[in-house]
């Protein structure tokens, strides 16, 4: 395993631990999710380039499309929650409350 792969895996684990530790605010959770998805994109692109697997060349691009959709939905949810409640706490996202 090369040094680049190790750095990408460290970036993924740092983003994952950030998501687990700082989950009270929605903005920090979205930033950690974005870091995880971008490190997965880099890891997928490096793996496909190293293995010369031509059938999976579109997988990183599809992953980026899903990441863009996730970011757009997350930011729309952040705007909606901050306009409704005034804060971006994740505890305000409970839809079972009346």
Curated annotation (Swiss-Prot):
It is found in: Mitochondrion inner membrane. Its EC number is 7.1.1.2. It is an enzyme of class 7 (translocase). One of its GO terms (molecular function) is NADH dehydrogenase (ubiquinone) activity. It catalyses: a ubiquinone + NADH + 5 H(+)(in) = a ubiquinol + NAD(+) + 4 H(+)(out). The keyword Electron transport applies. One of its GO terms (cellular component) is mitochondrial inner membrane. It comes from the Eukaryota. The chain crosses the membrane at residues 1-21, 29-49, 61-81. Keywords: Electron transport, Membrane, Mitochondrion, Mitochondrion inner membrane, NAD, Respiratory chain, Translocase, Transmembrane, Transmembrane helix, Transport, Ubiquinone. One of its GO terms (biological process) is ATP synthesis coupled electron transport. Disulfide bonds: none annotated. It is a multi-pass membrane protein. Belongs to the complex I subunit 4L family. Core subunit of the mitochondrial membrane respiratory chain NADH dehydrogenase (Complex I) which catalyzes electron transfer from NADH through the respiratory chain, using ubiquinone as an electron acceptor. Part of the enzyme membrane arm which is embedded in the lipid bilayer and involved in proton translocation. Core subunit of respiratory chain NADH dehydrogenase (Complex I) which is composed of 45 different subunits. This is NADH-ubiquinone oxidoreductase chain 4L. It comes from Lagenorhynchus albirostris.
């Amino acid at each position: 395993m090369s040094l680049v792969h190790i750095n990408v895996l460290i970036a993924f684990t740092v983003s994952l631990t950030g998501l687990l530790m700082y989950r009270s605010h929605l903005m920090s959770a979205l930033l950690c999710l974005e870091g995880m998805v971008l490190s997965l994109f880099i890891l997928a692109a490096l793996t496909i380039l190293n293995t010369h697997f031509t059938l999976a060349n579109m997988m990183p691009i599809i992953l980026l499309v899903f990441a863009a959709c996730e970011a757009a939905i997350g930011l729309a949810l952040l705007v909606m929650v901050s306009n409704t409640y005034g804060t971006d706490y994740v505890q305000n996202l409970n839809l079972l409350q009346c």
